[in-house]
Amino acid sequence: MSAAVVFILFVICLVIAIPVSISLGIVAVLPGAFDSSFTASASYVIRSMLGGIDSFPLLAVPMFVLAGIVMAHGKISQKLFDVFVFFIGKRTAGIPCAVIITCLFYGAISGSAPATVAAVGSMTIPLLMELGYKKDFSTAIVAVAGGLGVIIPPSIPFIMYAMATGESVSDLFLAGIIPGLLIGALLMFYAYYHCKRYGEDKEKINAKVSELRSKGLFSIMKDSIWALLSPVIVLGCIYAGIASPTEAAVISVFYALFVSLFIYKSIKVKEIWGIMVEAMKTYAPILFILAASTAFSRVLTLMQVPQTVSAWILAHFTNEIVLLIVINIFLLIVGMVMDTTPAILILSPILLPIVQSIGMNPIHFGVVMIVNLAIGFVTPPIGVNLFVASSLTDVPVMRIAKKAAPMIGYFLLALLLLTFIPAISLCLL
């Protein structure tokens, strides 16, 4: 069975709404089923699935998922938002910018884009609407800014990329900091432009900020400092050599539980079991996709797909700039129709040799790949962030996408800068 037939069958499975994990499992088994001489028998695929999830670094993923859910229940996003509103709330676009900064910080806690949208959006979208911002704009800005959750470290997709390519998780986390800040800054620039052009209800905004400031800086900081310290502790443990990324993920869970139970007292001990069940329900599908993606990736390697694709692309695109643009367009399209985990695990082994042949750093390519897929979070038809945000406000997905289009444009501008200026990603390494 040829690789082209395998990919066509995979697309057909997706089109007829077979779950991604099952689709991957089916197409991983088919080559061996139709050709008894092919190395990848059914037992090989099963062993590959089990081997794919038998990884110590991978343990960081469920831990970050659990930490994000604990912090969502613990109302930590509210504490983060309050401190940013205190300082910049009265400035032009101060409230939308505070939302974007909150997404940056919450992304540095949860490592997940949909989790960031759900936690920050459920709290900030009603407030934005109360202060006079239109529902479409309020929903769109949270949906797009939530994409920062997979770029700012710790990032679950970076862990997946490290697993697929053998690169350092710590280096990938470090490489994501400046790109995440750059994209956040561009989104804030757009928010400023939008508010300048369409205006704001300054009376309502000033009243809300004045009410918050009446509590005093000490009171706000006392409430917020524990939330602000969370990403500092997690990343500090990694880069100070105190803990590996996996161990830091466990630390983040205990820190989130400690702060939520004993400092903010926003969750009760009896709620912990429900939180753990929610985390398991969130992670279980990811684990199944991960196992099936690993098996499918190994089958493609046995079929020599990476070598074939690499040879074809390098033969037809000799200009490095054109090659990188083509790869970016391909990844953008993939991000629109495929979940992040299988996209990374299947495509990294195929595309990495191609970009390495033109001298591109694997860490740099990892950042470019994740930013491409992050744009897919807010792009129809699969854009997960759009559906999460829509569930919060009942705004139709396509209306959110239309309002988000200018912000996606700034995301694309950042992508171009990151692609052709490697120093943005690599300057901290």
What are these regions (language model features)?
Residues 1-429:
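Alpha-helical transmembrane segments of multi-pass membrane transport proteins
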